[in-house]
A protein has these predicted regions:
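Arg/Lys-enriched, amphipathic patches
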Residues: 102-105, 132-136, 140-150, 212-377, ...
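Active-site palm subdomain of RNA-directed nucleic acid polymerases
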Residues: 123-136, 516-534, 559, 635-663
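Surface-exposed loop/turn segments and immediately adjacent short secondary-structure elements
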Residues: 208, 212, 216-218, 242, ...
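Conserved pre-catalytic core of RNA-dependent polymerases
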Residues: 87, 383, 390, 418-628
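Short, conserved micro-motifs composed of acidic
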Residues: 172-191, 195-197, 615, 677, ...
Length: 925
């Protein structure tokens, strides 16, 4: 199907309804009127690949743009090399069916097309005519009448180009009034049949074009069935288990044997009691019978208009039916959204699943290119290339030299170290109860829902299995196998290096990983073994504590007129490159030995993985280094491995897992030399422990007015100077004012608001406020205590986002901002930032956030006045960036709080007391 949409955004619901009911495989669209603010996910139709190319000429008014929807089983591969011809509004993809390949294209030639633009179009046609091609589009030659083969001077070059390239034009009816604007060209007319010009697409003034593409595609209905774990009769299953003597059936002295017997029982229960359900019908969830009836009435009215010889009277009737159909369609969608919102307390998953489908479409992988530059056109080949790449980054460990690791554990290894582990049934039962039943099953096919429902029955045999596994230091092979899902990061989708592997492993194996991890973490915390510079995967530390701790040092040094240099470091494929023998040595230096260490050694040994794309899998590859991304235990092992990274450094260092940064005040060349020496030590550490830096991404930011901007080397590479850098998602710039971060947060928040406005039909307070709180406001408040704006323009611009959000609510549009906030139960963003400041101080004082409190605050010298006992001393600051940083700005507000608020025994209690205090204070005013 091809259509000139004249804006797809306001017709997307109707398009989805039409293609599902008519079972359309390919949809070519011109005049999409899309722009960069509109996300792919907003245009997503489940089961289809969506490709787009928006108008690039910013000087032109809105309009233009082309797109193609292709059903996923047709394996659409975008042909980006054809854009080199430089005809701007064109998009191409290849589709394949059983070995046959067809090139599909959509173009839009504007009415005022220049001679240069037309020449580019002719060059494009000349290039694509070498292939089996179908080209759809609005060519905007109104005087051209293909059914009469009449041409005039303006369209003559185009007709000559089509004829010279032996393309065939198939449309023999006008598509807009009496004009032949929309055409379908093909290289072989035998592959196209049943072409007809239909009714206008909704409110567009162009008629749609339908045709059938002949291919070797298997068009038999494939009924896909899945096991439905949420419809099983678990009571009946439990009764059946009572008839089985699991104490006898699930018994053995070997780990693999015991695991095999347990899985056989679980597979038997699965096959016997878990029902199969067919795939949901190809129908939008909000479509009702009434919607379908109105749409058919509209189509019937159009057919009457055509059969009447285009009598105006019948056209007027068609327009009435069209308006009713559009109105009913939108009403049905609004009612569906209201039902989801009203049931949110009992079924929040359905509501947010629906919303998330509008936020992001599932990223398709590729099309990838192999090492020879060949475009891969099937999922199996793509999976193989990705798996080869993921395996290529593994470290070949240098066993000829293993350096001595710093001894972090100072206790008695035998009596105080973590060398053995005994697991009880209560621990296993609790882990089973905590399983997220909505997660996927692992490669072994055992679903978390099944495990959760049978927690009472399974905790005894699993406890036996886990203890045997730990004591023997043996892990079942099933737990060491991973199905890897490639996640796109950024850059070109054609390059395998722009994908990150995430491993899907056995759920049962993850339960034991979790128990082992808990014991390791408890051991590390008890002996205070993890350095305070590490904020990732550690209790009481986070992105926020990392940023606060680091920027406290930066702003303090700048305030006393000391220039400071910040260096951001980037490890290359850090999690995948951890060499095992060196890791085991690090574990020993942290007091982990005996059967626990033996178990970890076995858990990491003989691992293998395969990559899966659309259920097509690569061959298995051995995993020879790294901690599995997606595992439970992996992150803890990683932070142990890099724990001593900064042990010998003088500069200030902050880490979040592998994200590492350092800073040093630079008052002289001697200070710069200290920082250089730290970089030399880091370079040596990376060589000793075989953790490579990605030198292209390691940068230095110079701060301070009198900064001499010294140069620094890491290895043999001079560090690139940067004015700003993204630090854990927050933009840090050389001015330290965070205006760029404000702009970035506003941009992302407005983008999400735009998605909500375009995608959510119902604009009730209930829905908009929920979506604003869940999806928009967090973008404005992520780690905001570390970058809270103090420039008036930034404060105003941030608040404007909430202005826009509350204006979207239909019932609030006539109210001023203050009244809208009251109606919606919202505070200003500025007030929320103050509240967040107070919460963070409370968490620091109470030790909930494990950050050096004395580095931020000093107790007030005279604390005998009214108020609480936790008052803070106020210090003087010279620069605005220091006056307005967290440790300085919070003091007055904190000291004014009454003891009744400060003495709360939990964070939630503090929040409630603070809110009551502020509300009462506002009322008194």
């Amino acid at each position: 199907m091809y259509v000139n949409a004249r804006s797809i955004v306001n017709k997307h619901k109707e398009l989805e309804l039409y293609v599902r009911e008519e079972n359309i495989d390919i949809i070519g669209i011109s005049e999409t009127w899309l722009n960069e603010a509109i996300l792919d996910s907003e245009m997503h139709i489940e089961g289809y690949t969506f490709l787009r190319k928006d108008r690039q000429d910013k000087d032109k008014k809105r309009g233009g743009g082309v797109a193609i929807y292709v059903k996923n089983d047709l394996n659409a591969i975008q042909r980006e090399e054809l854009y080199e011809v430089n005809f701007p509004e064109s998009i191409f993809c290849s589709i394949s069916c059983r070995g046959d390949s067809t090139l599909l294209g959509v173009i839009y030639r504007p009415p005022d097309s220049s001679k240069i633009n037309d020449e580019a179009l002719f060059s494009l046609i000349n290039r694509i005519s070498q292939e089996n091609v179908i080209l759809m589009g609005d060519f905007n030659y109104p005087e051209l009448k293909w059914d009469k083969a009449e041409t005039i001077s303006e369209s003559h070059p185009f007709v000559e180009c089509v004829n010279n390239n032996f393309l065939i034009q198939l449309v023999d009816e006008p598509t807009r009034d009496k004009n032949y604007l929309d055409l379908v060209l093909c290289s072989d007319e035998s592959i196209v049949e049943s072409l007809f010009v239909g009714e206008p697409f909704e409110t567009s003034d162009h008629q749609l074009i339908r045709f059938k593409l002949i291919s070797n595609r298997d068009e038999t209905n494939k009924i896909i069935t899945n096991l439905n774990y949420f419809k099983a009769n678990y009571s009946e299953m439990r009764e059946y288990i009572k008839t089985r003597n699991w104490d006898t059936l699930i018994d053995g002295s070997e780990v693999e044997d015991l695991w095999k017997k347990l899985t056989e029982e679980l597979y038997m229960l699965r096959d016997k009691f878990i029902p199969k359900s067919k795939k949901v019908k190809n129908k939008a969830k909000w479509v009702t019978k009434r919607v379908t009836r109105f749409r058919r009435a509209k189509t019937k009215a159009w057919n009457k208009y055509i059969s009447s010889g285009k009598d105006q009277k019948f056209f007027d009737r068609y327009k009435i039916k069209l308006r009713k159909s559009v109105r009913e369609n939108r009403k049905a969608k609004e009612n569906y959204e209201q039902r989801l919102a009203s049931n949110i307390k009992t079924d929040c998953k359905s509501f947010y699943s629906y919303v998330n489908s509008k936020r992001r479409a599932k990223d398709r992988v590729g099309p990838l290119k192999d090492s020879a530059g060949k475009v891969l056109n099937n999922d199996r080949e793509t999976a193989e290339v990705l798996n080869d790449y993921f395996s290529s980054v593994f470290t070949v460990e240098d066993l000829s030299y293993i350096p001595n690791a710093k001894q972090m554990f100072q206790g008695d290894l035998e009596s105080e170290g973590l060398n053995t582990l005994v697991i009880d049934e209560n621990t296993v039962g609790q882990k089973l109860a905590e399983l997220n039943v909505n997660k996927s099953q692992g490669p072994d096919g055992i679903h978390p829902k099944l495990l959760s429902e049978l927690q009472l029955e399974l905790k005894k045999p699993l406890t036996k299995l886990f203890n045997l596994s730990i004591s023997r230091g043996i892990v079942p092979q099933d737990w060491k196998e991973a199905i890897v899902t490639p996640l796109f990061k950024k850059g070109s989708k054609a390059s395998p290096e722009n994908y990150r592997p995430v491993s899907l492993t056995s759920v049962v194996g993850k339960i034991l990983e979790s128990i082992v991890k808990d014991q390791i973490v408890a051991h590390l915390e008890f002996f205070n073994l993890i350095k305070s510079s590490q904020h990732g995967f550690t209790k009481g530390r986070s992105c926020l504590t990392n940023l606060l701790d680091f920027m406290e040092t930066v702003t303090r040094e700048l305030d006393v007129s000391k220039p400071i240099d910040l260096i951001y470091l980037d490890f290359a494929k850090a999690f995948d490159k951890v060499p095992y023998r060196r890791l085991f040595k690090k574990l020993e230096t942290h007091g982990i030995s005996g059967s626990v260490l033996k178990w970890i050694v076995n858990w990491l040994g003989n691992r293998r993985q395969k990559t899966s794309i659309n259920k097509e899998c690569s061959n298995w590859k051995n995993v020879t280094s790294g901690v599995p991304q997606g595992s439970v235990l992996g992150p803890v092992l990683f932070i142990i491995y890099i724990n001593d990274l900064d042990s010998e450094l003088i500069s200030k260092v902050a880490k979040f897992a592998d994200d590492t940064k350092m800073c040093k005040s630079i008052s002289s060349a001697k200070d710069a030399e200290i920082l250089r020496n730290d970089l030399i030590r880091l370079d040596q550490w990376s060589k000793d422990w075989q953790m490579q830096f990605n030198l292209e991404k390691c940068v230095v930011i110079h701060m301070g007015q009198k900064n001499n901007q010294y140069e620094y080397m890491l290895g043999n590479k001079r560090l690139r100077q940067s004015k700003m850098e993204k630090d854990l998602g927050i933009i840090v710039d050389s001015s330290c004012k965070f205006s760029e971060q404000c702009n970035e947060a506003i941009k992302h928040a407005n983008s999400t608001l735009g998605m909500i406005k375009r995608s959510i039909t119902c604009k009730s307070k209930n829905i908009i406020v929920k979506l604003y709180k869940a999806l928009v406001r967090p973008k404005l408040e992520f780690c905001v205590q570390a970058w809270r704006p103090f420039l008036k323009k930034d404060i105003v611009n941030l608040e404007k986002v909430q202005h826009r959000a509350t204006k979207m609510i239909q019932a609030c549009r006539g109210l001023n901002y203050e009244d809208r906030l009251i109606r919606c139960g919202l505070s200003t963003l500025e007030d929320r930032r103050t509240r967040g400041d107070m919460i963070e101080v409370f968490k620091m004082i109470k030790g909930i956030d494990k950050i050096n409190f004395k580095n931020f605050f000093s107790p007030a010298a005279n604390n005998r006045t009214r108020g609480h006992k936790y008052k803070l001393a106020k210090s003087r600051s010279r620069l605005d960036i220091r006056k307005n940083f967290f440790s300085q700005r919070v003091v007055s507000g904190w000291n004014e709080l009454p003891a009744s608020v400060i003495e709360a025994d939990s964070v939630n209690s503090f929040k409630n007391r603070y809110d009551r205090f502020i509300n009462n204070k506002t009322v008194r005013m």
